[in-house]
């Protein structure tokens, strides 16, 4: 082989080498793009499956048989428990009338459906407030009678004797009359019933004494339990 032929072969080899290198690089680039595309599709598919089956993302509320969301129901239960625990230590009283005495209104706490709790006290027929605060005060009485020989006015009053100014004042009061002023003929023989309910929210002080009274206790109806009562609830 001549020197010129060897030189030409070397030159041809040098010219072919970049072409081969370019082809190799192009093949490698295509392989990388294919691999990246595969990983992207696989990742998107995996993410879709995780979201679809609820493994990640917003959790679905499981349902009770009645259709209520489990998570919402649990939250409501915890809220109710918390509210119950917070209110369980508040003063409360509910007293009922003594039906064994006549022509007077005497309150009792040692009876069914009656209670004194968390500092409330019943003393001298009055409920004693154990702490400053807002209180719901309520009372109900039921009057009954036979006929209307005379014009009758029935009053029911809830009063407060305040420790701060040592004076008894009315908190709640109502007046009713079962008989009209002009009594119709035959009304003397008919029975009548008059309920009076009082209730309101008041700012009270520790030591305040609350009383619930009527002007004509002889007309009170004690025939059924739950008709005459008096209560205080701290808010």
Curated annotation (Swiss-Prot):
InterPro entries for this protein: TNF, TNF_alpha, TNF_CS, TNF_dom, Tumour_necrosis_fac-like_dom
Q: Which SUPFAM superfamilies match?
A: TNF-like
What GO MF annotations does this protein's record show? Answer: cytokine activity; death receptor agonist activity; identical protein binding; protease binding; receptor ligand activity; transcription cis-regulatory region binding; tumor necrosis factor receptor binding
Q: Which domain of life is it from?
A: Eukaryota
Lipid moiety-binding region for N6-myristoyl lysine?
20
| Residues the UniProt record annotates as site (Cleavage) | 34-35, 39-40, 49-52, 79-80
Start and end residues of each THD domain? 91-235
Residue ranges spanning the membrane: these are: 36-56
Q: Name which cysteines form disulfide bonds.
A: 148-179
Listed A to Z, the keywords are: Cell membrane, Cytokine, Disulfide bond, Glycoprotein, Lipoprotein, Membrane, Myristate, Phosphoprotein, Secreted, Signal-anchor, Transmembrane, Transmembrane helix
Q: Which family does it belong to?
A: Belongs to the tumor necrosis factor family.
What is annotated about its quaternary structure and interactions?
A: Interacts with SPPL2B. Homotrimer.
Protein name, per record: Tumor necrosis factor
Q: Which organism was this protein described from?
A: Mus musculus (Mouse)
- What gene is this protein translated from? Tnf
């Amino acid at each position: 082989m001549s020197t010129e032929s060897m030189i030409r072969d070397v030159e041809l080899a040098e010219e072919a080498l970049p072409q081969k290198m370019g082809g190799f690089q192009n093949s490698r680039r295509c392989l990388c793009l294919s691999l990246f595309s595969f990983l992207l599709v696989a990742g998107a598919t995996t993410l879709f499956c995780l979201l679809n089956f609820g493994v990640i993302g917003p959790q679905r509320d499981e349902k009770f048989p009645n259709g209520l969301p489990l998570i919402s129901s649990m939250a409501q239960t915890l809220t109710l428990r918390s509210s119950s625990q917070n209110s369980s230590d508040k003063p409360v009283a509910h007293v009922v009338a003594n039906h064994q005495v006549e022509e007077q209104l005497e309150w009792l706490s040692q009876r069914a459906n009656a209670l004194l709790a968390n500092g409330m006290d019943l003393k001298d027929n009055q409920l004693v407030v154990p702490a400053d605060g807002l209180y719901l005060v309520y009372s109900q009485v039921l009057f009954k009678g036979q006929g209307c020989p005379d014009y009758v006015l029935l009053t029911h009053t809830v009063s407060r004797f305040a420790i701060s100014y040592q004076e008894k004042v009315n908190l709640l009061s109502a007046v009713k009359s079962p008989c009209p002023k002009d009594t119709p003929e035959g009304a003397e023989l008919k029975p009548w019933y008059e309920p009076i309910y009082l209730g309101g929210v008041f700012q009270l002080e520790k030591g305040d004494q609350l009383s619930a009274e009527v002007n004509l206790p002889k007309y009170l109806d004690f025939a059924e339990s739950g008709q005459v009562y008096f209560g205080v609830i701290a808010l």
